[in-house]
């Protein structure tokens, strides 16, 4: 159930990260422009996803971090460090450690995350609905994501 709710967000996260990286590479040459653009992106992401993310359970949030790592190839710590700063990454790592979590932990498809990797394989192969039905005898609930790209206002900067 957690996977079904969270994986679509990780897939959208991958698309948005690629969009941000592409915009930075093509249109942002100065550090101040980059910082302004990243700040605008952050505001847009909060506007789009804050309600949904805050509505997730702790386990769903942890799974989302793992799946974002799988899709983007970066731990939550590395993403924060890359797009914000080392200071921000260290701050959030400290907060995570207070709750016995680690933003630096990586997705391990052959080890502790092998079961999650199998679920990703089933989803990506297009067999998710029948797999879900075989377990729960009902169709999987759909996660509705408002948008999969950043708005044009963010892209223009």
Q: What residue ranges belong to the model's regions?
A:
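Sec-exported extracytoplasmic/periplasmic mature domains
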Residues: 8, 22-25, 29, 43-61, ...
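Early exported N-terminus immediately downstream of N-terminal targeting peptides
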Residues: 1-37, 42
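Flexible, glycine-rich surface segments
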Residues: 39, 46-48, 63, 152-157
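Short, charged/polar micro-motifs that form catalytic or ligand-binding hotspots
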Residues: 6, 35, 39, 51, ...
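Amphipathic, charged alpha-helical segments and their helix-to-coil junctions
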Residues: 62, 69-154
């Amino acid at each position: 159930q957690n996977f079904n709710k969270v994986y679509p967000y990780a897939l959208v996260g991958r698309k948005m990260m690629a969009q941000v990286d592409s915009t930075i590479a093509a249109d942002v040459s100065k550090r101040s422009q980059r910082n302004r653009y990243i700040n605008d992106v952050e505001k847009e992401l909060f506007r789009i996803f804050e309600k949904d993310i805050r509505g997730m359970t702790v386990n769903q949030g942890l799974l989302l971090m793992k799946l974002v790592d799988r899709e983007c190839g970066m731990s939550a710590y590395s993403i924060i460090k890359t797009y914000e700063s080392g200071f921000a990454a260290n701050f959030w790592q400290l907060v995570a450690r207070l709750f016995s979590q680690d933003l630096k932990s990586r997705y391990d498809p052959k080890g502790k995350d092998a079961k999650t990797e199998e679920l990703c394989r089933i989803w990506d192969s297009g067999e998710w609905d029948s797999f879900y039905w075989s377990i729960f005898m009902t169709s999987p609930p759909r996660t509705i994501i408002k948008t999969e790209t950043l708005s044009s206002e963010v892209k223009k900067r």
